[in-house]
């Protein structure tokens, strides 16, 4: 399924990253790119941006370019607003287009379940609905960050809001069903990015296995993945 959605031409972000490095450095070296997708596509999880970030880091090493972190961040910002964050990881507040980052302490790793309904919402179409007004703006990012710093990810989840839920839920009942499936069971849940993936906060990994069984028993055809948060120290 994912392979059908991957583009292999010049519009692929991994190849765009290579071209951007060549343009910036004047390096004429080439590279054979083997792209193994593990992050679901069109899921609001930044998979394409992560590909670009990995390419920037890899090319800097393999071509021995010795680009500084600042140079990599600047190149990354030209590729996408998420790329600078994905070059560094951790926990950060994004301003501007999301490329201006202020880092804060990461909470301890927590287990998560990612649930992706079969709802297609192109990012551009989702952003096209935004009119600058949102209930989410009333949620203070300072409160969320404070909970993060106190290692209280549950309170951070419940204090957070995603504007795209307001914009997309009225026209996509499956998104509402998906979120309520988890919140009705007491799990803090929020849609990530422009959707449609739901991020479900767990207490222990066995809960994820139980939820996957319940999803199947309820007849929902959702992709679900078990993962956990990470800190900058966890990155290679």
Language model segments and positions:
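Phosphate-handling active-site elements
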Residues: 23-32, 58-76, 204-219
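Conserved, helical-rich catalytic subdomain that frames metal- and/or nucleotide-binding sites
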Residues: 88, 93-188, 203-216, 220, ...
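Short pre-catalytic strand/loop immediately N-terminal to key active-site residues, enriched for Gly-Thr
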Residues: 31-44, 186-189
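Short hydrophobic/aromatic beta-strand micro-patches
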Residues: 199-201
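N-terminal beta-alpha supersecondary unit
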Residues: 1-29, 40, 228-235
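DPxDG-like acidic metal-binding loop motif
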Residues: 43-69, 85
């Amino acid at each position: 399924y994912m392979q059908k959605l991957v583009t292999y031409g010049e519009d692929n972000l991994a190849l765009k990253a290579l071209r951007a490095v060549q343009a910036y450095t004047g390096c004429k070296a080439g590279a054979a790119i083997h792209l193994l997708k593990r992050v679901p596509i069109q899921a609001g999880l930044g998979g394409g941006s992560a590909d670009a970030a990995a390419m920037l880091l890899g090319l800097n090493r393999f071509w021995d370019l010795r680009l500084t972190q600042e140079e990599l961040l600047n190149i990354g910002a030209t590729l996408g607003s998420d790329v600078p964050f994905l070059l560094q990881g951790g926990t950060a507040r994004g301003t501007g287009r999301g490329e201006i980052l202020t880092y804060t302490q990461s909470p301890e790793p927590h287990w998560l379940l990612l649930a992706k309904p079969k709802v297609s919402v192109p990012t551009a179409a989702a952003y096209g609905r935004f009119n600058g007004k949102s209930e989410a703006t009333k949620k203070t990012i300072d409160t969320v960050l404070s909970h993060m710093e106190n290692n209280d990810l549950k309170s951070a989840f419940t204090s957070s809001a995603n504007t795209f839920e307001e914009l997309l839920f009225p026209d996509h009942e499956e998104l509402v069903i998906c979120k309520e499936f988890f919140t009705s069971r007491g799990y803090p849940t929020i849609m990530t990015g422009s959707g449609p993936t739901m991020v479900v906060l767990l207490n222990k990994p066995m809960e994820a296995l139980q939820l996957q069984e319940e999803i199947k028993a309820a007849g929902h055809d959702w992709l679900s993945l078990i993962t956990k948060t990470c800190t900058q120290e966890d990155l290679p």
